[in-house]
Amino acid sequence: MPRGQCRQQGPRIPIWAAANYANAHPWQQMDQTSPGVAYTPLVDPWIERPCCGDTLCARTTMEQKSTASGACGGKPAERGPLTGRMPSSRPHRVDFCWVPGSDPGTFDGSPWLLDRFLAQLGDYMSFHFEHYQDNISRVCEILGRLTGQARAWAAPYLDGDLPLPDDYELFCQDLKEVVQDLNSFAEYHAVVPCPLPLASSQLPVASQLPVVKQYLARFLKGLALDMGTAPRSLPAAMATPAAFGSNSISRSALLEQQLTKESTPGPKEPPVLPSSACSSKPGPVEPASSQPEEAAPTPVPGLLESANPPAQRPDPAHPGGPKPQKTEEEVLETEGDQEVSLGTPQEVVEAPEGPGEPPLSLGF
């Protein structure tokens, strides 16, 4: 096989970084076997990742491939110091070196610095389950270098409150959003202050007393207008807060009693009934023409007559004096005698005209 084809099948020759790139770029790796030798990563961590997260494993593989390609050309290649070395379960990268003057919390506004940090973090978060547990301590160590807003975001992972996610891409994407956009951090982690709720769901009674007083005053006014009485002001007993603390039964009884007093008129004399209504045995109603005096009897209550002393009564012997008023008993006796004596018109005609004259006969 031609020598050029063998070179095309092998990997590219690593390009050593220039001095300015090595000084400006914080991503520097140290060879553990030969200290002091600095080199750039042989593979881009965002394009091609090693199998176990170890860069030594990748370099050993490349050296073995170079040896195989050299053997194809018939010229053995020199083996490096790491040729044939088994990859270790723990990565041998040194800790990430921050650029002087940069803030790990905001990364000093340098997106490339954040990308390199996430790249190193991704090397320790292996895709193989057998290396994942060994790399957790290194991941936490890298997260511990964060400060500011990013440190607050990584605190649950460092404290053990949240487990490290299995999906590393989402983990890095979330961290990148938090570091670059502080508003997203405030959205997910800010504590919104809220006032403490009241011990009771009901509002305090003291603040509602003026409203209750106005409502009761309007209620009493409307009720007084319906009852036809003059409206009265709110009682002082109901305006005090102590009245609201009593039971509702006593309040309603007090209100009803006051409304009853308002609707009841003042003391009046009992109505004077006619003498005919006072009789226990009602008689037949006679026409007004036959009994003109009894049709409209003079209502004289017995209480007024009994209150007058006997000395003030007029003397019946004097003809010029006023006619003495009859008592209620005399009126009843007179009415009874008249009812007995009254009869048909024929009986009235047959009655004797005088005490000494004989009765007149109508027959001729």
UniProtKB/Swiss-Prot annotation:
Record's keyword terms, sorted: Apoptosis, Mitochondrion
Disulfide bonds: none
Location of this chain's protein in the cell: Mitochondrion
Database matches in InterPro entries: DUF4939
Entry-linked Pfam families: DUF4939
Region described as Disordered: 67-88, 258-364
An individual GO BP term: regulation of mitochondrial membrane potential
Sequence ranges of Pro residues compositional bias: 311-322
Primary localization: mitochondrion
Gene Ontology CC, one term: mitochondrion
Function (record text): Could induce apoptosis in a BH3 domain-dependent manner. The direct interaction network of Bcl-2 family members may play a key role in modulation of RTL10/BOP activity.
Free-text comment on this protein's domains from its UniProt entry: The BH3 motif is required for pro-apoptotic activity and for interaction with pro-survival Bcl-2 family members.
The protein's assembly and partners: Interacts (via BH3 domain) with VDAC1. Interacts with pro-survival Bcl-2 family members, BCL2, BCL2L1 isoform Bcl-X(L), MCL1, BCL2A1 and BCL2L2. Interacts with BAX and BAK1.
Name the record gives this protein: Protein Bop
Species per Swiss-Prot/TrEMBL record: Pongo abelii
